[in-house]
A protein has these predicted regions:
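C-terminal cap of thioredoxin/glutaredoxin-like
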Residues: 1-18, 49, 53-60, 142-239
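Class I S-adenosyl-L-methionine
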Residues: 12-36
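Short active-site neighborhood of thiol/selenol oxidoreductases, capturing the structured segment around
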Residues: 33-49
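Residue-level preference for long, well-ordered alpha-helices that form the structural scaffold
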Residues: 46, 84-91, 180, 184
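Structural alpha/beta surface segment adjacent to cysteine/selenocysteine redox centers
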Residues: 51-147, 233-239
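Short glycine-centered, acidic/aromatic-flanked micro-motifs in structured strand/loop junctions
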Residues: 43-45, 110, 208-210
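A general structural motif
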Residues: 36-38, 65, 203
């Protein structure tokens, strides 16, 4: 009998994740000097599994020097779908177990449902324009999943924005822009349709070339595909 439902009983996952040398690839473009396909992450700021998937995707992209394209999607409940309380509690405890295995902080949650999600996505394009979208999304995810920061408040959001190297005064003006609101809602839906159209129904989903996989526990398969590509590329480059 386990005293805690969050105890890690069996752990064989991720043991070799990003532990091997990244190999080399043939030269590519100036934007993608290694000539690799990019890594795409379909992501929801409210999804606990996306929180883990984000950190693993960033780690993977950095280890293999891959471009990472984060594509935010509205949470199911903000699209009119119901999530039973029992399922929510299962996800919380399961995420705690997964986070513990990976050495990630999780559990001091400030649910961003509603305004917290909207404000995140509203500022995402601004972060992209500064080239700091990964840092912004990561800081936001840490804030609402591990630090109990209420992103729907100006005080909470200001902290996240400033941690990400963004200008709070400018960010605040974007929050009340009808044009920005329409824009992010459109690209969030476009991202969802792209994900569905390629055969995945939920987040986090990872895409590398033609390979698209759902679930933060599948990212090891993505790494295998990267390594296979690099092995093949290295053989061609040598020949």
């Amino acid at each position: 009998h386990n005293e805690s439902t969050d105890e890690v009983v069996f752990n064989k996952t991720y043991i070799d994740f990003c532990q091997q040398p990244p190999l080399i690839t043939s030269p590519g473009s100036s934007e993608n000097p290694r000539g690799d396909k990019k890594l795409v992450l379909f992501f929801s700021i409210r999804s606990p599994y996306s929180y883990i998937g984000l950190q693993q995707a960033i780690k993977l992209a950095q280890h293999y020097q891959l471009p990472l394209d984060i594509k935010p999607i509205l949470p199911m409940i903000m699209r009119g779908l119901l999530v039973p309380k029992v399922k929510k509690m299962y996800i919380f405890h399961d995420t705690k177990r997964e986070a513990k295995k990976l050495g990630l902080d999780y559990g001091f949650v400030a649910d961003p449902l509603g305004a917290g999600v909207e404000r995140c996505y509203c500022l995402f394009s601004y972060a992209q324009s500064l080239g700091c979208e990964q840092q912004f999304i990561l800081n936001y995810a840490l804030a609402v999943n591990a630090q109990g920061i209420r992103a729907e408040t100006d005080a909470g959001l200001k902290l996240i924005v400033q941690r990400s190297g963004m200008d709070w005064d400018h960010a605040r003006t974007l929050l009340t822009s009808p044009a920005i609101d329409r824009e992010w809602r459109q690209w969030a839906e476009d991202n969802r349709q792209q994900m569905l159209g390629q055969g995945s129904w939920g987040v986090p989903s990872f895409q590398y070339g033609e390979l698209l996989l759902w679930g933060q526990d599948r990212i090891g398969i993505i790494e295998q595909a990267i390594r296979e590509d690099r092995c093949n590329s290295e053989c061609l480059f040598k020949n």
